[in-house]
């Protein structure tokens, strides 16, 4: 069994990261440079948890980015091995390679595994929580400890994984109420560890005990495009005295432009002066505006959320920020620095 594991898991990993081999290099996104920046300086970025950057550093050590992508492939392959063992009662190399080949050819898994972004932890969190909740005696004590640490890392690495994990724990709670055997505490523990890790890293790096010290800016970006936040601004300005009162004539605008465009109100004031770390500076009033939008028009916010979810589920696109200009600014300097 150990020999089969030692052979099948690396072979499965190779299948799961085939896009990197096809590309001749790990796949990169413009944000990959930011995560590399976290440990190369080091630097606490206002818009990203200080989690995935250290994970990358643990495997590249300023030598090669192939280390992290191979690690991601091995982690995912090993979780599929454990899942097979829990579901079937045992795991075999042939079944494992077949499962990895199916995932590599019929799902988006290889494009996440070959990409240096924390998105890879979404399937890792799902599989890990399943194993913790339903693995039972099929897992050793070491494997349960490993899964606890891995799932906690995955939840903390991307804030979207926290509601995902909470939702899965909620389903497990319902199953437990229906007398279905599930280890609810084992599933909840990595969520608690992840939340604690976010509190600690943000307290150290930003001086604020919070899950996302500046997350209100992202909510504002979304709600001003959808309308509820823009309605609040136009109703309350100029009396509210908010910074954005000076630019209400430019709103709403696409959320992505609001956050990142060099000439957006976030990054350049009404006089044309650049605002360094404009998103970070906007956070206090962003929280106030979002709170007022939720109070004033909760149904409108809910409708916008449902509509955005439907659009996202039905819309598919590739190549976002994969042009040379983005890489020249965001990624290449970090690779050269390493």
Indicate where each model-derived feature is located.
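Transmembrane-helix motifs of polytopic, lipid-linked glycan transferases
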Residues: 66-97, 101, 105, 124, ...
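Transmembrane-embedded, aromatic-rich helix segments that form part
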Residues: 124, 160-175, 187-191, 212-213
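Short acidic/glycine- and proline-prone juxtamembrane loop motifs at membrane-interface regions
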Residues: 111-121
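Membrane-proximal stem/loop segments at transmembrane-domain junctions that anchor or position
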Residues: 211-337
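Membrane-interface alpha helices of multi-pass inner-membrane proteins
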Residues: 144-158, 190-198
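Specific aromatic-rich, kink-prone transmembrane helix
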Residues: 82, 121-138, 143-151, 169
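Extracytoplasmic catalytic/substrate-binding loops of multi-pass membrane glycan-assembly enzymes
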Residues: 21-35, 43-55, 59, 63, ...
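Transmembrane signal-anchor helices characteristic of membrane glycosylation enzymes that use polyprenol
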Residues: 2-27, 104-105, 190-202
């Amino acid at each position: 069994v150990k020999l089969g594991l030692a052979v099948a898991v690396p072979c499965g990993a190779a299948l799961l990261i085939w896009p990197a081999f096809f590309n001749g290099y790990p796949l990169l996104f413009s944000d990959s440079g930011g995560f590399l920046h976290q440990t190369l300086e080091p630097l606490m970025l206002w818009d990203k948890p200080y989690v995935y950057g250290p994970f990358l550093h643990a495997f590249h050590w300023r030598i090669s980015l192939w280390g992290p992508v191979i690690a991601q492939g091995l982690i995912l392959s090993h979780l599929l091995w454990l899942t097979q063992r829990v579901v079937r009662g045992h795991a075999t190399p042939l079944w494992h390679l077949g499962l990895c080949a199916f995932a590599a050819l019929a799902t988006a898994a290889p494009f996440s595994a070959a990409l240096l972004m924390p998105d890879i932890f979404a399937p890792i969190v799902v599989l890990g929580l399943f194993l913790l909740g339903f693995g039972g005696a099929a897992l050793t004590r070491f494997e349960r400890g490993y899964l606890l640490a891995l799932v906690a890392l995955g939840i903390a690495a991307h804030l979207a994984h926290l509601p995902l994990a909470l939702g899965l724990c909620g389903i497990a709670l319902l199953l437990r109420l229906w007398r279905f055997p599930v280890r609810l505490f084992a599933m909840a523990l990595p969520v608690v560890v992840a939340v604690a890790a976010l509190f600690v890293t943000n307290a150290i790096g930003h001086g604020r005990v919070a899950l996302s010290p500046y997350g209100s800016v992202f909510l504002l970006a979304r709600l001003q495009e959808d309308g509820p936040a823009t309605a609040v601004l136009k109703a309350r300005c100029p009396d509210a005295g908010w910074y954005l009162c000076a630019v209400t004539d430019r709103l709403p605008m696409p959320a992505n432009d609001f956050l990142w465009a060099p000439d957006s109100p976030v990054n350049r004031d009404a006089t044309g002066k650049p605002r360094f770390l404009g998103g970070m500076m906007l956070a206090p009033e962003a929280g106030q505006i979002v709170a007022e939008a939720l109070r004033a028009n909760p149904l409108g916010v809910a409708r916008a959320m449902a509509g955005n979810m439907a659009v996202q589920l039905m819309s598919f696109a590739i190549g976002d920020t994969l042009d040379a200009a983005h890489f020249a600014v965001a990624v290449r300097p970090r690779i050269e620095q390493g």
